[in-house]
């Protein structure tokens, strides 16, 4: 576990995953962490919203994702852990599979439950899908 992808949404469960890695890095200081926050694209049907408005909504979602990632990045930086932040639009599991391949990650460390855009606890089903679809080991942190 040297190059780790962490799906991060700011939920208590995701915070525990970051805390786990901070402690892990005390023993394995060569750890590299990729924080990723995946936002769902705004999709509105009909002629109610212009394409420019949809672009603004998506840009706002990515800005929000960067703010969320920044909180965990501060903790990783304070612990001296090499890290990078990634904010993407798309379907969560699909984007996580892409990120694992793109960044050469050999492990995914994630919480068992997270927050949806509406504040509902939904990551349990996402965690299950990640375990089945990501081509590397997945460590779930309770």
Summary of predicted features, one role per range:
Residues 3, 107-132:
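Glycine-rich, Arg-bearing micro-motifs that act as flexible, cationic patches
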Residues 133-142:
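Short, flexible loop segments at boundaries between secondary-structure elements
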């Amino acid at each position: 576990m040297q190059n780790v992808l962490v799906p991060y949404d700011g939920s208590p469960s995701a915070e525990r995953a970051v805390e786990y890695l901070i402690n892990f890095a005390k023993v394995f200081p060569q750890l590299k962490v990729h924080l990723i926050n995946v936002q769902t694209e705004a999709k509105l049907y009909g002629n109610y919203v212009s394409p420019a408005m949809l672009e603004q909504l998506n840009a706002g979602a990515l800005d929000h994702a960067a703010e969320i990632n920044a909180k965990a990045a501060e903790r990783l930086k304070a612990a001296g852990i090499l890290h990078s932040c990634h904010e993407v639009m798309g379907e969560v599991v699909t984007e996580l599979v892409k990120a694992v391949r793109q960044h050469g990650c050999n492990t995914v460390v994630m919480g068992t439950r997270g927050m949806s855009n509406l504040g509902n606890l939904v990551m349990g089903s996402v965690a299950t899908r990640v375990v089945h679809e990501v081509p590397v080991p997945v460590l779930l942190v309770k």
